[in-house]
Amino acid sequence: MSLLPRRAPPVSMRLLAAALLLLLLALYTARVDGSKCKCSRKGPKIRYSDVKKLEMKPKYPHCEEKMVIITTKSVSRYRGQEHCLHPKLQSTKRFIKWYNAWNEKRRVYEE
């Protein structure tokens, strides 16, 4: 043990420690904000014919489930809005199944 007083760390070390602490705090808050899935609730009742596009996005790090996003036609009552459907709901699974069947049938008639 020394009798001499300890020297304070240099200013650059204190700045580096403060910057590292701020970076860790920013990463933690970003993770907390982004931890919720967009498709956590049941979506509105939409007819197959009102759907312009159906997208199935893969799992992301912030969400444990895949995302099912539909875009409605601009002439429908939803006026081109995007809706996210909960992928585990039975109604969403049925919607995807019947939308794909309806879309295949529609393609045959359009060709």
UniProtKB/Swiss-Prot annotation:
Disulfide bonds: 37-63, 39-84
Source organism superkingdom: Eukaryota
Pfam families on file: IL8
Keywords: Chemotaxis, Cytokine, Disulfide bond, Secreted, Signal, Ubl conjugation
Keyword Signal assigned: yes
Signal listed as a keyword: yes
Ranges that cross the membrane: none
Domain notes per entry: The destruction box (D-box) acts as a recognition signal for degradation via the ubiquitin-proteasome pathway.
UniProt-recorded name of the protein: C-X-C motif chemokine 14
Biological source species: Homo sapiens (Human)
